[in-house]
Amino acid sequence: MHFFQSSLVAATMGAALVAAAPAADLETRGSCTFTSTSALKSGKASCSTITLQNIAVPAGETLDLTGLKAGTTVVFDGTTTFGYKEWEGPLISASGTSITIKQNPGAKIDCDGARWWDGKGGNGGKKKPKFFSAHKLNKSNITGLKVYNTPVHGFSIQSDHLTIKDVLLDNSAGTKLGHNTDAFDVGSSTYITIDGATVYNQDDCLAVNSGEHITFTNGYCNGGHGLSIGSVGGRSNNVVNDVTISNSQVINSQNGARIKTVYGATGSVTGVKFQDISLKGITKYGIVVQQDYENGKPTGKPTNGVKVSDITFEKVTGTVTSSATDIYILCGSGSCTNWTWSGNSVTGGKKSSSCKNVPAGASC
């Protein structure tokens, strides 16, 4: 048995030391329980199962789960908390191959984002740490985490063959001052599956900026900006291909199903499917495709450098508020092609008079 503490690393046997184990971080036959970030950092490399027990992450530090040996299982236990500092984060970072990240019953990750929320998100005010960096977390699984009140962005995903299942991200306390609390931002990734997510937030529930073979299904999105592709363009990777967003609900959000591309940029959005999406209480657009984003804002002037082709909107149904627009399609000349439009019904709002270059078969 090994006991990891900031001032002691000992290997010994005896009943007296065994009795002291609850106060220490214990590793036995590859199973390790850590109660501090310093112990985790020094001991994680030798562990096949890591339990994180009531860890209080010091201000300005990352809970470092990078470089784990292949096949490691990480288990959050109790309540994980974070000290306050204005910095970029992330609060948690994980990488490795064939990693499983999960939690014990009753556990939660409480970011206490209200300490940072000022209504400005990432656009000014306090510098806010992002929550979870899942970069190079390949052939891995994140399952059942319950996350509360991220200061700003939630999961940043740049990985291959990563499955995220039954995750709760609850920023409902940030309705007034939370901003840019995106749940899942996906970029430069392949074979990503997000299944059964429950999200309460103030920005995109899902944003796919680049990547291929991505699935978001059985999701519930409340209070944010909806299910989004983009903005696509202006990055090092400007290709989105083979994305299926299905069997999901979008409630009390700005947008329902959205594709947005950057003004004057190049790239491609192909093989994207929105299927069986239920909308309720949408305040801006039920279905929206815009090719006019510049500096994060629409210009009303679409360009055609990003091709938006082989797109399916199927059974996107529900209601928007009376001040919202049911459907808005603003494409560049010749850039939106080969769309499938079937069984869509968005009602309750206004009909747009500003649609341009609507592809054959679609309605606006």
Swiss-Prot record:
Database matches in SUPFAM superfamilies: Pectin lyase-like
InterPro entries: Glyco_hydro_28, Glycosyl_hydrlase_28, PbH1, Pectin_lyas_fold, Pectin_lyase_fold/virulence
Carbohydrate-modified residues: 138, 141, 338
Known EC number: 3.2.1.15
Catalysed reactions, as listed in the record: (1,4-alpha-D-galacturonosyl)n+m + H2O = (1,4-alpha-D-galacturonosyl)n + (1,4-alpha-D-galacturonosyl)m
Molecular function via GO: polygalacturonase activity
UniProt PbH1 repeat ranges: 159-188, 189-210, 211-231, 240-261, 269-291, 303-324
GO CC list: extracellular region
Cysteine pairings via disulfide bonds: 32-47, 205-221, 331-336, 355-364
Residue stretch(es) of the prosequence: 21-29
Species, as recorded: Aspergillus fumigatus (strain CBS 144.89 / FGSC A1163 / CEA10)
Name of the molecule in the record: Probable endopolygalacturonase B
First-level EC class: hydrolase
Compartment list: Secreted
Gene responsible for this protein: pgaB
